[in-house]
């Protein structure tokens, strides 16, 4: 697309569609038949800091990359941070709506759907066939297991078991997804 940047380390599969004003930088691999909507940034440095002896925040190097599978759609104005040491991974057939954030070291499983405004903090695992409703916030380090579903605006602060529906602040289990 117009005004897009694809860095020299980026590896693109066949039939990748990149729309306008996209930035893809660092060690990024994108699979076949994947679409990246306008305004998205892939491979940005993650939000990781430590405090020095004087209490000043010092950036932690992010040496990993981003691996995006095949048949993925990344919506407009998404940000996907590269991993700290390991890669941030988005598996095949994942679909993200507009304005989603996927942080460093996250792993998103196959056929997972992220609706508008989802924010996933770092080092989080989202397994396969998960639905994250609009505005879902996921704290760092949790696991949302296969076939789980979050309600609109859910704040996920702990692991979500396979096939459960959670909602609320903080998110609580309501029922099985396929009752």
Feature-to-residue mapping (PLM):
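Structural signal for interior beta-strand "rungs" in well-ordered beta-sheet cores
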Residues: 1-167, 171-174
